[in-house]
Amino acid sequence: MTHYSRTKLYGLLCTCLCFCLLPVRAQDIASNSNSLIVDARTEVICKSMTQSVERETRTVTILNKKGLDAAHFFCSCDMFRSLQKFSGELINASGESVRKIKKSELVKSEYSSSLTTDDYLYYYECNYPSFPFTVKYVWEVKCNNGLIGYSTFMPQMDFSQGVEKASYRIELPAGQQCRYRTLNTDGKNIQVKESTGPEGQQILEVSAAQLPPIVSEPFGPSFAELFPRVYFAPSAFSFDKKQGDMSTWQKYGEWQYSLLKGRDLLTEPFKSKLHELTANCTTDREKVKAVYDYLAKTTRYVSIQLGIGGLQPITATDVCRTGFGDCKGLSNYWKI
């Protein structure tokens, strides 16, 4: 028997062993999967409108090469979110711990399509020469200076991925309210339970179990149309010292509109320039064309996303002075 054949046979034996160790129902799920979420837990503890701690544990078994992406770790951070703790463990098909993964091994990337942003990413690419193998990650994220939304419960992250069990728990102090919305959960083994803690806390718990893999089909529905998830959002919130209410679209729109207050003022020299450009125009269309042509020559799109700047536009005065702004900054400037 050749070395290649022995290696291939060993891989098949390991896969069979892995399946034999799984419960019957889990075997059914795994048989059509490239990766299997063995256990995923998320706990969100909100301490106030501006602070929270998110603790996550994810154990996933990679059944073949096509499921390898599920073995990697990613954590997005910014000036509001920071990774506090992390640990990982790689386990082979026999259930033996191969190695521990430390936080110092994570790669930090600040790569972005924006000119400047406070977003950054921690990631770890997990690779192992034989399948199946299991990887377990445990991490904690601290949120400060604002909470405009909470993590989404999404038990399945990719096509051909089964789920043995997944859970999500969020707790808010008395007086705060969290709303939720389910999507694509009908007919699936996903439950949402709401309760009140001993000190008046609002507690929401979501559980999912034995979710079969979703198979990608040519010209089939998109990821967003198929995958189950539960969204969570506060009613009243505070974000970068700006308080708002998103219990209704009307109230959230009023908060968004308040971010524009005082940011659409133009300098007197620029106002004079606009009058000069449109002085000889006889129709509104000619005026619009004159202003548009001038702004097209004197402004450029540049993405700068810092803090609440991801939602609040740069002032019209600064766009006039520098000649650049992002989409909302230029739109605000062009309201003239």
Where are these regions (language model features)?
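Secretory-pathway-linked proteins and extracytosolic
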Residues: K142-T152, D158-S160, S167-I308
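Conserved short loop/turn motifs at secondary-structure junctions
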Residues: F73-D78, F153-M157, L277, G310-F324
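Lumenal/extracellular ectodomains and adaptor appendage modules
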Residues: Q27-S167, E268
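Second-shell loop/turn segments in exported
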Residues: Y120-E125, L260, L274-C281, A316-G325
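Conserved structured core elements
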Residues: S52, P129, G162, D264-E268, ...
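Generic beta-strand/beta-sheet core signal
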Residues: I91-A93, A209, L330
